[in-house]
Design a protein with these regions (language model features):
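Feature captures hydrophobic
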Residues: 1-103
Length: 103
């Protein structure tokens, strides 16, 4: 298992615990992952375009997330909803966000 696969495993396992909203992720390898309640009115999606996306989240947290968006390493149909889902599930997100930030 390489580092990127390991980071995918960590992030996606933690995302299973989100309480608010519904998040659909199309991973770099084409796998479709679904988290949260599909009946929730708050929905967002992420299409990951670079294999190192989840590793960067673990390494650099929200700064890396913003940088990845600016570098077009992922895309979403609704950035506002994605940010709201992240904010409403911040206790879950913080379990992996910036986990490897050594600064």
């Amino acid at each position: 298992m390489n580092l990127y696969n390991l980071s995918d495993t960590i992030v996606f396992k933690i995302l299973r615990d989100i309480d608010f909203g519904y998040l659909e992720i199309i991973n770099f390898d084409g796998a479709i992952l679904k988290f949260g309640n599909p009946n929730d009115s708050l929905k967002a999606n992420i299409k990951i375009k670079k294999q190192n996306f989840t590793f960067n989240l673990i390494k650099g947290g929200s700064i890396s997330f913003a940088e990845s968006y600016m570098k077009d390493e992922f895309e979403t149909d609704n950035l506002s909803n994605l940010i709201e889902i992240t904010a409403r599930n911040i206790k879950i997100i913080h379990k992996f966000s910036g986990l490897l930030d050594l600064q």
